[in-house]
Amino acid sequence: MYRRLGEALLLSRAGPAALGSAAADSAALLGWARGQPSAAPQPGLTPVARRHYSEAAADREDDPNFFKMVEGFFDRGASIVEDKLVEDLKTRESEEQKRNRVRGILRIIKPCNHVLSLSFPIRRDDGSWEVIEGYRAQHSQHRTPCKGGIRYSTDVSVDEVKALASLMTYKCAVVDVPFGGAKAGVKINPKNYTDNELEKITRRFTMELAKKGFIGPGIDVPAPDMSTGEREMSWIADTYASTIGHYDINAHACVTGKPISQGGIHGRISATGRGVFHGIENFINEASYMSILGMTPGFGDKTFVVQGFGNVGLHSMRYLHRFGAKCVGVGESDGSIWNPDGIDPKELEDFKLQHGSILGFPKAKVYEGSILEADCDILIPAASEKQLTKSNAPRVKAKIIAEGANGPTTPEADKIFLERNIMVIPDLYLNAGGVTVSYFEWLKNLNHVSYGRLTFKYERDSNYHLLMSVQESLERKFGKHGGTIPVVPTAEFQDRISGASEKDIVHSGLAYTMERSARQIMRTAMKYNLGLDLRTAAYVNAIEKVFKVYNEAGVTFT
């Protein structure tokens, strides 16, 4: 069953006062996006005059500064929410003092607090020496620890890690994960190094972070990112636990995305891709938004294209395929493939593992041109930043752009998509599945017990006794004893009757997190009359939450 904003499921969680009439909300949203005024203006739906906090951040080039890109999006959200933040302050101050306080805290939130730049030597297997460069940026400590991945790439720069760290702050706030934002990068191409050399680099980088106080269970917790995975996270955990964390019982909580044997959690590998799926699901099943786009709700008749067939792209493709959408194109750095009849994710994964590339896949042909401009309903950029620009945005044919990567859309492209009535589901919401499940893993490490272990047998026995109680009640009612009225669980209930596994709990928690956050974004978009500008709505939500922490904590040392 497809939803309209504000119906029973949402009302039961947020309360009727939080949302108002479902019909009125949907009508207001639909009217705004089509450029029609609402029949009767409602509270919160008045158009907002945006303040231009930073004109310099509005870079109009195809390759804008990444950090200024994020700052520009922040400024857009801040200009909208400032009046509400002033209004909500419950202090004995004048209007001017309140506004100064709000603007001051917004200036505190925006910059990157710490950036560590380091270099260290390694001896390679052939006996030569090389100096490795690396960075770690901590954007905000309004919540600790800081959280953010480590990527290995020759494109790593100070600007990139600062931008990604700031995105992590807002991302965590959007999905209510209590972390500050951080990011790290090591400037190497991992394909040019042996496994032994990569282990040396990873362990030495960990020690350099530890010496500077940039890693620890309560300080800064890295995670996998581009070209890193379980193996690298295991090396980091072992290095920290064997050295500076030797006496810390929580040492293995210094990093997430670890193998299960090292304190990892079931469902972490696929978490970001699964989060992308749930994020798309929440909007594609929303009848009001689909009506705006001229589409029918649900995945059944939808086609999609994935740019980037790494961890995020693969698992996004798997889940969309499983729920009825058809993948017609996949793009990688060395080329793209196309099949209008559909591409099976498992077959493509096996082919790439065997051949090292998607090119040559027998059930698809090579796609000439940019896969970003291919004909589809849903486009999932899941590669790197700044892929959708002012140059190619007018040629994008998809009606929904689901940002699986960080920062794939430049501000100018974002503006073009809004003008063309294309829905962009923003990165700071859509790819938050990874950090959400990383949070679950971190909690598991601090609790030193896996999810479900303490309740597994109790739940199974409770379900058994419930069924027996129902059966005995029916037998007493109809005077038949001895099991002549058996109560047989349905197949779906039978799957759950033995209790939830750790993976079940993780998947359920992730789905709920993405659903709740999507509802918050939808409500904010309606409240501020933003229509399809979901990115600004997400930034508004993030800014409100981070602002509240700073404001209530106080700013004594200023």
Swiss-Prot record:
The protein's name: Glutamate dehydrogenase 1, mitochondrial
Residues engaged in binding GTP: H266, S270, Y319, R322
Amino-acid positions noted as binding ADP in the UniProt annotation, renumbered to this chain: S450, R516
Transit peptide: 1-53
Enzyme class of the recorded protein, top EC level: oxidoreductase
PANTHER family from the UniProt entry: GLUTAMATE DEHYDROGENASE, GLUTAMATE DEHYDROGENASE 1, MITOCHONDRIAL
Keywords, comma-separated and alphabetical: Acetylation, ADP-ribosylation, ATP-binding, Endoplasmic reticulum, GTP-binding, Hydroxylation, Mitochondrion, NADP, Nucleotide-binding, Oxidoreductase, Phosphoprotein, Transit peptide
Modified sites of kind Phosphothreonine: T410
Residues annotated for substrate binding in this entry: K147, K171, S438
TM spans (from-to): none
Purpose: Mitochondrial glutamate dehydrogenase that converts L-glutamate into alpha-ketoglutarate. Plays a key role in glutamine anaplerosis by producing alpha-ketoglutarate, an important intermediate in the tricarboxylic acid cycle. Plays a role in insulin homeostasis. May be involved in learning and memory reactions by increasing the turnover of the excitatory neurotransmitter glutamate.
A GO molecular function held by the record: glutamate dehydrogenase (NAD+) activity
Domain of life of the native organism: Eukaryota
Family label: Belongs to the Glu/Leu/Phe/Val dehydrogenases family.
